[in-house]
Amino acid sequence: MKVLKGSFRDACDVYGFIKYNPARDLRLPRFDKRREDIKHLYTQKEIDLILNKFSNNDTFTCVFLTSCYTGMRTGEVCGLTWDDIDFEKETINIQHNVYDKPKDGKGRWYIGTTKTETGTRKIHLSQTLKIALQNYKKKQDYFKKIYGKRYIYYNVEDVKNQSGKVVEHRIVREELSNKDSEKINLIFTRENGLYLGTDITRTPFKIIHNELGIKKCRFYDLRGSYAIKILNNGVEIRDVADLLGHKNIETT
């Protein structure tokens, strides 16, 4: 593409062989590898099988249900805090995305804004998910009392570059964080409060692949399955795009 555009530019602007450069506004189409992948569309039977298998794993069950009923991205689900959930108004405020970097002594999980500007959105909290999250919160509060001082809490601290500009926000255990850091009420943690970020789905999906025999499925595929489900229920494509945080319906 660079050679083609350069040749036409020289022919037009340098040598005057042509009056108009036909390659001036030429752009290669964006290639999104993930969109090229064959997605797995979960059946209700598979979802029921998975939920039954992990009925004793409250954290993964709630993570799985959250994606099933919202179509949120993996990093968005794992970045949810209790401050994002409004049980009274039955809404979820999606405003964070979690990602990892090589561990540097303080932690490897970072929290930022959503993937795109339209990714920041407020969606409805269904009754099924509401009840699941309320029950999960009760258990989490119970374990906080049981573990007492041994329970792990987290803060978010600013990461600055050499010029002193804040460039990222790192999730750090409370006892390791800076004085000016702020507490974060992460939802999906181990019973002792340990935060695993998106790794919370890793071991369960090995079991799903190897023991349940649902091959090649990914946690991310719940997003597409949710979109197909609500489309089949009559939701307009523009509304589906908004729920998923897509700017363009072509992405959806």
Go through the PLM ranges and name each one.
Residues 1-25, 73:
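N-terminal DNA-binding recognition helix of tyrosine site-specific recombinases/integrases
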Residues 60, 119, 182, 213-216, ...:
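Exposed loop/turn and edge beta-strand positions of beta-sandwich/beta-sheet ligand-binding modules
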